């Protein structure tokens, strides 16, 4: 099977005053095309830092992060921006929606860096994206008019409208109640299967991790794969 990610000896070191903190420590990992891997671990043990490295939001202090053979740490800022805009979709715990934009406008904003086709085509794509997450009737609503679960559905539509190869999700259900959590994870699993996405999902929730094909645990910056 084709490898989408290959990480070799990846470390990330930050300075905290007079001391250094190794948030990610010598991680080796491969992720196959179309695979779903869940990363678990306690707060502050490097999960989100690892996801930032996978998404090109940060560069490793040492080691290599290859995405489809391209070394993300060696790409220019402009090249990384292009990769993030086309190949990777991001979903965050706090939704990261623009409060003054409607659901449809928040989703459409993801197409702006791509200079996607005309307004009519963008609107059609936005409508299809919102329909795919069950929010066709909420297109004109502001985030403040939506529940937490609905806001996360908008965020999922925004991540997927670019038709990325990779979906990176950082605690996507952390702000949701148990029932809504189950609905959002079921939706993500459905979209993952339908679209053949490569999904890396960070969560402290064991119930979510059990749905993934593989699970890894981060502890003090070290990654251990579980069967």
Give residue spans per PLM region:
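Short, low-complexity, intrinsically disordered N-terminal peptides in bacterial proteins
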Residues: 1-2, 227
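ABC family nucleotide-binding domain
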Residues: 4-219
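Conserved switch/coupling elements of ABC/ABC-like ATPase nucleotide-binding domains
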Residues: 220-226
